[in-house]
């Protein structure tokens, strides 16, 4: 019998077979897809920002190291804070 490292529906989480339950394997699949996706470097805009470790992202072109989220370079909360800061800066520049 040949063991497959992935399945059609679950993807790479198929390596666990029927263990741990479907819901957990689907969550794992979603995290692994986000984690291994190529992201754009905020320094040079090259689309090869790779995860080096937990919350550490490195650009393959310019070598910039960025601290971000565990599975994505920018978390949802980080995006909200960035937008809020940008709004404050824009409102202050309008006042001057």
From Swiss-Prot:
Record HAMAP family: Ribosomal_eL43
Gene of this entry: rpl37ae
Lineage of origin: Archaea, Methanobacteriati, Methanobacteriota, Methanomada group, Methanococci
Cofactor: Zn(2+)
PANTHER family tied to this protein: 60S RIBOSOMAL PROTEIN L37A, LARGE RIBOSOMAL SUBUNIT PROTEIN EL43
Binding site for Zn(2+): 41, 44, 59, 62
Subunit structure: Part of the 50S ribosomal subunit.
Name of the protein in its database record: Large ribosomal subunit protein eL43
Function: Binds to the 23S rRNA.
Keywords on record: Metal-binding, Ribonucleoprotein, Ribosomal protein, RNA-binding, rRNA-binding, Zinc, Zinc-finger
Record flagged with keyword Zinc: yes
SS bond list: none
GO CC field: ribonucleoprotein complex; ribosome
Cofactor annotation remark: Binds 1 zinc ion per subunit.
Family of the protein in this entry: Belongs to the eukaryotic ribosomal protein eL43 family. Putative zinc-binding subfamily.
